[in-house]
């Protein structure tokens, strides 16, 4: 349906010769590679010659530039937006949107009106965002979650940014379909600086990490280790360090404060009324910009403050001479822990729920 809705003048057929990577399922220009090698998979590119259908991307250069520079399509982080603006300004070339049945091994969606060709996987795959919602049959899900939704967000890896920030919006403009409103572009998890890849064989299995450390700890680790605008190098050793940090900083604080509260005040302390509006607004800003590392760093600054409070005031000592002062210290620590538990709900839902259960009023 999407193909058929595109403007007829935007799709045409011509012979094509290009450098192709099977792993990326993408063509590369000679100026974008060195030694005829795929920059992602480090394998030699194939020279492919065949007649294909092309999408006239050059028709949309000015519209795409205005769309991105005006933030009608917001791209995070800023360095990725700048990358795409530079790419569009350098001049857009029309791109292939079909493959021969032979090269596709007779697998794929046939081109409307031409059974000798199948749609190029990116035309097919990108349309899945809306087809999964019922676009092809005008279902309510498409209306609710795409056509009439105010936020249409894609979360993508940096290696496919051009497909999502340039090709996909142009296809949608041609078809008269609403565009995504935001793209969050993340880097790679790397092993010693190399992208994890099945073809290279340097893969860490998430299931094994979860079995060893639990899903909450792994989620925390991955979100805190990934720099906002770059790749994040990970290893099991790094996870063990973060896991110990989580236990020592947060786990120990939660257990220690609960134990003192139970021992000295029968587990009953009235929490102070604290205005967390600024902190909540800061967290909302981090989350709305998909800066999960900053979100967690900010949250754990509060954990550090609570630990410092306990070390400085030493309620386990002052309870003997000034129980009201000890109670206030523990109440303040309890309130910080309660706020931290709330902040961690989207990151570590099981652990956060347990914190809130223990520190509820």
Predicted regions and their residues:
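Short Cys/His-rich metal-coordination motifs, predominantly Zn2+-binding knuckles/fingers
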Residues: 22-24, 40-43
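Short, glycine/charge-rich beta-strand/loop segments that flank catalytic centers
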Residues: 14-27, 81, 185
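N-terminal Rossmann-like or analogous alpha/beta NTP/dinucleotide-binding catalytic cores
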Residues: 1-11, 25
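A short alpha-helix-loop-beta-strand transition element characteristic
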Residues: 9-15, 45-46
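Cys/His-rich microdomains that often coordinate metals
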Residues: 28, 44-45
């Amino acid at each position: 349906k999407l193909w058929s809705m595109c403007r007829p003048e935007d799709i045409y057929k011509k012979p094509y010769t290009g450098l192709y990577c099977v792993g990326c399922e993408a063509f590369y220009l000679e100026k974008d590679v060195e030694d005829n090698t795929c920059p992602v998979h480090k394998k030699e590119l194939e020279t492919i010659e065949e007649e294909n259908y092309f999408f006239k991307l050059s028709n949309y250069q000015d519209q795409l530039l205005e769309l991105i520079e005006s933030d009608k399509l917001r791209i995070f982080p800023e360095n990725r937006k700048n990358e795409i603006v530079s790419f569009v300004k350098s001049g857009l070339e029309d791109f292939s949107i079909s493959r021969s049945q032979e090269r596709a091994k007779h697998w794929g969606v046939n081109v409307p009106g031409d059974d000798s060709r199948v749609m190029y996987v990116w035309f097919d795959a990108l349309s899945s965002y809306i087809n999964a919602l019922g676009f092809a049959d005008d279902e309510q899900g498409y209306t609710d979650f795409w056509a009439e939704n105010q936020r249409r967000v894609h979360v993508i890896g940096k290696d496919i940014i051009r497909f999502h920030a340039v090709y996909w919006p142009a296809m949608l403009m041609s078809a008269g379909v609403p565009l995504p409103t935001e793209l969050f572009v993340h880097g790679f998890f790397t092993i010693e600086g190399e992208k994890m890849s099945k073809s290279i064989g340097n893969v860490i299995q998430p299931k094994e990490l979860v079995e060893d450390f639990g899903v909450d700890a792994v989620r925390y680790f991955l979100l805190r280790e990934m720099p906002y605008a770059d790749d994040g190098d990970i290893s099991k050793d790094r996870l063990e360090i973060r896991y110990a940090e989580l236990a020592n900083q947060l786990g120990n604080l939660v257990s220690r404060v609960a134990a003192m509260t139970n021992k000295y005040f029968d587990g009953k302390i009235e929490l102070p009324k604290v205005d967390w509006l600024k902190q909540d607004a800061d967290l909302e800003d981090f989350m709305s910009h998909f800066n999960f590392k900053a979100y967690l760093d900010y949250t754990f600054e509060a954990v550090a403050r609570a630990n410092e409070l306990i070390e400085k005031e030493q309620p386990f000592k002052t309870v003997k001479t000034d129980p009201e002062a000890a109670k206030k210290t523990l109440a303040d620590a309890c309130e910080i822990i309660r706020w931290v538990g709330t902040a961690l709900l989207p990151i570590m839902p099981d652990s956060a729920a347990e914190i809130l259960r223990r520190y509820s009023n």
